[in-house]
Amino acid sequence: MNKKADIWISAVIYVALGVVILAVVLAATTPAINKMRDRNTYLQTKEVMHKIDSTIRDVLREGPGAQRTASIEIQRGEFSITTGADNPPTIAPKKITWTGPSKYIASQEGSTITEGNIKISTIKQGSQYQITLTLDYTNALAGLNTDLKTLSGKYNLLIRNEDAGKISIKGI
């Protein structure tokens, strides 16, 4: 009878030891996994921004009436389009911006770097960083019109050259 109890006690100790080891491994790897996930989100969003920029510049180069579609997916963060319509008719900002929290550091904290036409900035906020990717068309476009202000999830965009450097972006 005593031998049977010893076997059960040993089994419980081995299971408890296994659970403790599993918990330690998970606690050690979770921050690294989260940082890699944030890095992948940043890289995918940067690729989306390059795609949108390339499409806008192609449509602009082709002249009035030219249009293209772009499929995008915004997984995390806030993707917004500023048309400058709320500002006086001086030089109003025309920007496409993505901002999101991250454990990944995309650029030196507090400075802005340029990669192609994308401006990348990183600001420390508590234990995380706030990454901002910006496409600034203020000096490149006469107008930027859209029915979309903030995007999240999957979208098909129609980017069209309306006339004389005016671009419209619509969800389809």
Per-segment meaning from a language model:
Residues N2-T29, R37, T41:
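N-terminal single-pass transmembrane signal-anchor helix
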Residues K4-V12, A70, D86-T90, K103-I105:
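Solvent-exposed, charged interface segments at domain starts and junctions
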Residues I13-V15, R39-Y42, A66, E78-S80, ...:
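A generic structural micro-environment signature
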Residues V24-L26, H50, E73, I113-E115:
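General N-terminal targeting signals
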Residues N34-A66:
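Membrane-proximal N-terminal amphipathic helix
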Residues K51-S54, E73, K149-S152:
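Short amphipathic alpha-helical surface micro-motifs
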Residues V59-I81:
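Short, glycine/small-hydrophobic-rich surface segments
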Residues T82-I172:
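Intrinsically disordered, low-complexity regions enriched in Pro/Ser/Thr/Gly and acidic residues
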